[in-house]
């Protein structure tokens, strides 16, 4: 028993380190942190095997995908010189296996959510205050070169810090609401996180982050349907409506330009208008159009196996890029992993509120992965923090699979109750 507790504790510390590693700007840079991450996973794996880790067919396929990535990388680079370049794929599969291990055991990790939120609060406020003083830093932090290292080491993050929170946003909002009635301290931490997130996302002015957050919140609050696909179509409809309003309603466009004056969002609005007037994409929109065209061209050229070489697609689309680079197999593995959490909870807990949360969660995951890249920084939030948030909500509201079965039985019993008509005289 004591040994089992020790194994659990080692795993808890390992998971906490791994999630902090994925979200911390200062841990993005130096190799020492990556070595620490692989050491943490090694310790976790030893403990998991001791506790009875088992894999299903999908996990073996995911490991096969890692083997494919490694082989292609070695062939392309004539050796192991860039073996860590596709690190997000290694982390994605490892976290997928770890998340599967915790199904039915998520209570062991409940403690990490407030800790992660406290880290995020600090990073968000630090980053928001920095980009408020110098808005150009937000665009600089999207780049991947040594020029940004000074900022990262200070805890100032950009894309890799903000977007993992965006794809978790609707679940966190509902978690804060539920925590207010069940765990008041958690709720206070959550509200502080929400304030820091809003400040960061508004001042960083990443247009996809703002749009994805707003649309997912709209779906969470107002969409009551069953289908996540329909929810996504509704979101696309809202997106198209917004674009048409910007192009055709001068008052609305001017209001947005005034609100976002001097920011990247204002630049994108101007690029959109210029593209419409010239009949061709302009500025940053042109960059994205070229990237998406490159991805689509590669998918049509190599629909089965993909281009395989690094950056086969044009970029700016994680989902499209996986199909372009690794074909049907890679795209399938990405979808199974990246969308697994909301799909699982929507299937296992068919309660209306869980369905609403899962639909909003799927919409923002699809929106971001279709229109932007995904790095390993997403994976701690997507595959560890998000399921814990679902589990907290389910526990606080007393929603269990058994309860649902009881509800089904009750409904069947009501259906089968014989109706006795009153006797007539």
Where are these regions (language model features)?
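Hydrophobic transmembrane helix bundles of membrane-integrated enzymes that assemble
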Residues: 1-255, 294, 300, 317-419
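Glycine- and aromatic-enriched alpha-helical transmembrane segments of multi-pass membrane proteins
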Residues: 423-425
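Mature, Sec-exported extracytoplasmic domains of Gram-positive
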Residues: 256-260, 269
């Amino acid at each position: 028993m004591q040994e089992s507790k020790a194994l659990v504790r080692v795993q808890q510390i390992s998971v906490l380190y791994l999630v902090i590693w994925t979200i911390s700007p200062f841990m993005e840079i130096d190799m020492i942190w990556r070595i620490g991450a692989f050491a943490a996973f090694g310790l976790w794996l030893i403990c998991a095997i001791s506790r009875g880790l088992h894999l299903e067919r999908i996990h073996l396929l995911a490991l096969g995908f890692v083997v494919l990535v490694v082989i292609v990388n070695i062939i392309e680079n004539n050796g192991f010189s860039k073996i860590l370049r596709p690190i997000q794929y290694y982390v994605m599969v490892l976290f997928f296996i770890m998340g599967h291990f915790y199904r039915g055991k998520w209570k062991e990790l409940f403690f990490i959510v407030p800790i992660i939120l406290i880290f995020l609060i600090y990073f968000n406020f630090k980053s928001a205050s920095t980009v408020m003083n110098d808005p150009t830093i937000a665009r600089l932090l999207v780049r991947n070169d040594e020029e940004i290292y000074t900022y990262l080491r200070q805890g100032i993050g950009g894309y890799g810090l903000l977007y993992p929170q965006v794809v978790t946003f609707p679940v966190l909002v509902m978690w804060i609401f539920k925590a207010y009635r069940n765990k008041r301290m958690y709720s206070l931490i959550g509200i502080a996180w929400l304030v820091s997130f809003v400040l960061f996302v508004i001042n960083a002015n990443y247009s996809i982050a703002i749009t994805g957050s707003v649309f997912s919140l709209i779906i969470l609050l107002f969409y009551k349907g069953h289908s996540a696909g329909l929810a996504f179509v509704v979101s696309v409809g809202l997106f198209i409506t917004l674009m048409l309003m910007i192009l055709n309603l001068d008052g609305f466009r001017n209001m947005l330009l005034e609100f976002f004056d001097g920011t990247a969002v204002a630049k994108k609005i101007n690029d959109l208008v210029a593209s419409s007037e010239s009949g061709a994409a302009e500025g940053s929109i042109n960059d994205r159009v070229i990237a998406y065209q490159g991805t689509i061209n590669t998918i049509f050229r190599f629909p089965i196996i993909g281009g395989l070489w690094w950056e086969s697609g044009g970029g700016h689309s994680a989902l499209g890029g996986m199909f372009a680079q690794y074909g049907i197999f890679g795209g399938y593995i990405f979808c199974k992993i990246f969308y697994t959490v909301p799909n699982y909870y929507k299937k296992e807990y068919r309660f209306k509120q869980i369905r609403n949360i899962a639909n909003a969660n799927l919409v923002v995951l699809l929106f971001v992965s279709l229109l932007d890249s995904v790095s390993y920084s997403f994976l701690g939030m997507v595959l560890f923090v998000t399921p814990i948030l679902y589990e907290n909500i389910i526990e606080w509201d007393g929603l269990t699979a058994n309860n649902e079965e009881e509800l089904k039985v009750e409904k069947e019993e009501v259906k089968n109750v014989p109706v006795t008509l009153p006797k007539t005289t």
